[in-house]
Design a protein with these regions (language model features):
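Non-catalytic, mostly N-terminal accessory regions of nucleic-acid modification and defense proteins
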Residues: 1-177
Length: 177
């Protein structure tokens, strides 16, 4: 029986996640120049991480949203239901987005618009709305979403710790620099 060094395990996990994410660049080839890949990959990684974090409490958030949608201030209720400082009230997941290629742009925008204001602010600062349009116009949006749906692209906290996720982002930023 061999015991794996936890440091090597962490390093391998970070490299694996960064490589899976980096492979999305293959889908962008042609419509994007290599120096532009980060315009898509970094915000998509943020979106996928948030999505995967929220997946276990998704139904609780949707139920709470139905219960408080008439209230002027509902943010605190929804944060509590999600267990995070952010939430998503959209009925979409990456899996349901993947199931409807015909309406991918509208559905993905509805998914993004379902995030709490703090997440939408982050994505706006990254100029992600323009990239969604550009990917859709280039017929790439669906494929990028499919690429992020793989089992290896699972970025839930049970697969990738917060510290590891920081290293994954650092690795990606270095690749795009």
């Amino acid at each position: 029986m061999s015991i794996e060094n936890p440091i090597h395990s962490v390093g391998r996990n970070i490299q694996e996640k960064a490589s899976v994410i980096w492979n999305v660049a293959n889908s962008l080839f042609g419509a994007y120049k290599p120096h532009e890949y980060g315009l898509v990959i970094l915000p998509m990684t943020v979106v996928k991480r948030f999505h995967d974090c929220l997946l276990p409490t998704r139904q609780a958030v949707l139920d709470k949203y139905e219960a408080v949608r008439h209230l002027a201030v509902k943010d605190g209720f929804l944060r509590e239901a999600s267990g995070y400082a952010f939430y998503n009230t959209s009925p979409f997941t990456f899996e349901t987005l993947r199931a409807d290629a015909e309406n991918i742009e509208d559905n993905f925008r509805a998914f993004i618009n379902g995030f709490s204001d703090n997440v939408q602010d982050i994505l706006a600062q990254m100029g992600f709305g323009e990239q969604i349009k550009r990917m859709a116009d280039s017929n790439l949006l669906y494929q990028v979403i499919v690429d992020f749906c793989s089992e290896k692209a699972d970025m839930s906290p049970r697969k990738v710790t917060a510290v590891d996720m920081g290293y994954v982002f650092e690795n990606l930023v270095q690749r795009f620099s």
